Amino acid sequence: MSLRDKLFVTLQYLIPQHALSRLVGILARSEVPWIKTTFINMFMKRFGIDLSEAQIEDADQFPTFNAFFTRALKADARPLEASESNDIASPADGAVSQLGAIRANQVFQAKGHDYSLYDLLGGDSALASEFTNGQFATVYLSPRDYHRVHMPFTGTLRETRYVPGDLFSVNEATANGVPNLFARNERLVCIFDTEQGPMAVILVGAMIVAGIETVFSGQVTPLPKQVVTTDYLRSKPIALEKGEELGRFLLGSTVVMLFPEGKAKFAPNLKPGSQVRVRGKLGAYTNENKH
């Protein structure tokens, strides 16, 4: 790591992560014209935001910064390219951080850093065993990206697990410098049952992420500092189609997907750093090693 990256990571430990995120959340929800306009204009200039694909193309028409940040795209902006029945779709616009095999119960984060399924899934060993020796993919959403998360594959929601934690920034520097980054940051674990077996879609929070929303329960973070499990099989089943919206980040972050052993095969051209677009083909299910 460079000296600059080391200093950046050290600063992450010193900053009051949750207090800063709450403050940003207040500003991001503000409807005061000069506040929301100032933040939107600064953000657009800093990150080169293009609104031509958005349903609302005039930045002045967004009521809050959050509305701007979680803007919807035009219906034809992201066609479903993962159109074959076994195709797995990218859940978001962004860059592949890592992807590949889960070694026993260890998920690769960066050189010299792994984290466990048990920790990632909030301390549930039975749930972790469903993905032992499976496949994973991690997609990082940069500030300029579209920040809604969509379904990689059609499934029925089994449960969600809100796991409290830190709010480290998520980028290459922290992936290389913060052990267990994705298993220590605040996150929402969504478990779906699909025709190919269980699938986990995990929305990982980060510095100044003021919350995570889902289409089935609204805003789910922040919550009390304990794991909160919600069983969705006891109520009316919630089924979401491949490519359908699942949730959104109120600022930043990362999506981690988990698939069972012998089920998922990623596109051979994908590697760390590859750019992906929501509903694009990430890979496909295969039954080559079906047990």
Curated annotation (Swiss-Prot):
Membrane-topology annotation of the record: Peripheral membrane protein
Domain of life: Bacteria
PTM info: Is synthesized initially as an inactive proenzyme. Formation of the active enzyme involves a self-maturation process in which the active site pyruvoyl group is generated from an internal serine residue via an autocatalytic post-translational modification. Two non-identical subunits are generated from the proenzyme in this reaction, and the pyruvate is formed at the N-terminus of the alpha chain, which is derived from the carboxyl end of the proenzyme.
Cleavage (non-hydrolytic), annotated site positions: G252, S253
Main location: membrane
Cofactor field: pyruvate
Details of cofactor binding: Binds 1 pyruvoyl group covalently per subunit.
Pfam families: PS_Dcarbxylase
Catalyzed reaction equations: a 1,2-diacyl-sn-glycero-3-phospho-L-serine + H(+) = a 1,2-diacyl-sn-glycero-3-phosphoethanolamine + CO2
Pathway: Phospholipid metabolism; phosphatidylethanolamine biosynthesis; phosphatidylethanolamine from CDP-diacylglycerol: step 2/2
Positions of post-translational Pyruvic acid (Ser) modification: S253
GO cellular component, one term: plasma membrane
Annotated active site: D93, H150, S253
Gene Ontology BP, a term: phosphatidylethanolamine biosynthetic process
Enzyme Commission number(s) from the entry: 4.1.1.65
Localisation: Cell membrane
The entry's keywords: Cell membrane, Decarboxylase, Lipid biosynthesis, Lipid metabolism, Lyase, Membrane, Phospholipid biosynthesis, Phospholipid metabolism, Pyruvate, Zymogen
GO MF, any single term: phosphatidylserine decarboxylase activity
Family as reported in the entry's similarity comment: Belongs to the phosphatidylserine decarboxylase family. PSD-B subfamily. Prokaryotic type I sub-subfamily.
Subunit structure: Heterodimer of a large membrane-associated beta subunit and a small pyruvoyl-containing alpha subunit.
Task of the protein: Catalyzes the formation of phosphatidylethanolamine (PtdEtn) from phosphatidylserine (PtdSer).
UniProt name for this protein: Phosphatidylserine decarboxylase proenzyme
